[in-house]
């Protein structure tokens, strides 16, 4: 039997739909406390966009460099997990992840709408990011209807700019 003692990368989405801090719960259990009696039934819709320093128009090639401007979106149902700031240098030697953008809403449609707005408000200058990819994905009709599969991205067209595209500034 295998035991995974780590929390999964996508735990943020689970936390948002059940409205509970899984990291806090995991620490309590490790300290010998009993698992909480919270109702863990999903009550919301949530999705996460991993914002990486990558060039989506060049096969997602990493784009190390210095972030010259960083402004994350805010608002009800919008969460940004990051360690990055203006002046931060994205190294070519490590993971290119800049932030996890998580949005939560009552319905999938509302969640997509909120994610579009949050992506439009997210400002990262100095390196190319995956923000244009996520904007384009939010505009895709198949994605909006939940009609996608594991091979979906192989046929996804990134050549055209997304409707809500804001030009990225790379110096």
Locate each region found by the language model:
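ATP-dependent carboxylate activation and anion-phosphoryl transfer catalytic cores
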Residues: 1-171
